[in-house]
UniProtKB/Swiss-Prot annotation:
Species assigned in the record: Latilactobacillus sakei subsp. sakei (strain 23K) (Lactobacillus sakei subsp. sakei)
Signal peptide range: 1-20
Protein name per Swiss-Prot or TrEMBL: Foldase protein PrsA
Annotated lipid attachment (S-diacylglycerol cysteine): 21
Positions in coiled-coil regions: none
Subcellular location per the Swiss-Prot or TrEMBL entry: Cell membrane
Amino acid sequence: MMKKWLLAAASLLMVVTLAGCGSNTIATLKGGKVTQDEFYKEIKETSAGKQQVQQMILQKALQEQYGSKSLTKKIDKTYNTYKKQYGSSFTSVLAQSGLTTSSFKNQITTQMLANAALKANKKVTNADLKKQWKTYEPKVEVQHILVEKKDTAETVISELKKDNSTKNFTALAKKYSTDTGTKKDGGKLPVFDSTDTSLDPTFKTAAFKLKTNEYTTTPVKTSYGYHVIRMIKNPGKGKMADHKKTLTDQVYAKWANDQTVMAKVYTKVLKKADVTIKDKDLSDILSSYGVNAKKSSAKSSSK
């Protein structure tokens, strides 16, 4: 879908560019020519073309209402972080996703503007925080040993009963673990919390039950095999009041990925933008947001 949008955007940009050059002809051939009007008519009648026009209107409305110098600095900082992370392979990595440096930056801009609109139009209530708190777990650090067979995991657990030190667990990970990505580092995983989606839910549930220095006394079965998990650091859940900012951020992150929530936010943004549609063939372009844009007296340009 993203590629279709980009294609439509490139096509519309071509129309604008040619119009700026004062030429109505895109191409000539024996017996005829292709004009801007013909090209525009074809593009606007496609679902991708209509979707792109819709996105362009929304983008401009978001920029007008929520754009700022401070936001621009955040956008640049985020973009440069990714650029530094991927180094010389940055452009090639983007190309694999059908993106250019320019379209990627536009993507970051759209995301940050959308987040700003979300926070301005929907506030997190105490009820929202309490709901989030029910499943909240703080960031923890664990190390694990992954094996194929249950009896191997039980052997590891027997060894840990004799010595549950970090040193011994690390040695056991190097000896038994089939997780080649972590065994050299003693099975250590990046820190994670309850919002993490990269780990198996069963693994997370077992891990969150452990206090610092504790380990799972029975093998934890997932689709990858059998795990033995040791908690390196678990700060404990504590009180909700101590995690209000984190909980608020988590609620907003959840809403940002909820199409129903964001559609309502965009509806407010577009209504405030007071949009007028000049092309009658696109008069219902914002109907999916429940917005009836003003219609200009101008005729359709699809002739």
